[in-house]
Amino acid sequence: MRRDERQIQEGMKTRISCCSTQDVTVLHCAPMFDVILYQPEIPPNTGNIIRLCANTSARLHLVKPLGFTLEDKQLLRAGLDYHEFATITVHEGWAECEERFKGRRLFAVSTKGTQRYDQVGYTSDDVFVFGPESRGLPAEILGSVATQQCIRVPMVPGSRSLNLSNAVAVVLYEVWRQSGFSQKV
């Protein structure tokens, strides 16, 4: 196990910041947004989201229990070599995670959302929580969020849900777009 994986498992954050050089340009941005995956189940989805967060300078929060270990081969493969550029925090449960974001605007992303994700004005201080792939966010979390902060990504009638990593990408890029893609692109 690599050192940064041990730190993540122990609930610590790991952030490797690098800068541009004449020969090589690597990722470096101040973290902008926070994404929470509540009890994620499928390792490749989380791996893709790790890569997405590294590329958009978003912080990723995972709420236990997880449906995999952080050494899972599929998770590591999907994230390619971006794991070292992501800021990841593992929370023991929802109460701990919720406390961490007390006082900030929390958006629950759900097929049950009443507000379309693209009809909301976002700030870099906003937090976005996504539920597990097989069942979505529990009523406890949905009920704790103001109705206008329960957002959805539209789909054609009869569709059940989007892939988790796709839904995170759609929402995160809208949030970043609204900020004017505030980091260098």
Task: List each model region and its residues.
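Post-transcriptional modification and biogenesis factors for structured RNAs
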Residues: R2-V185
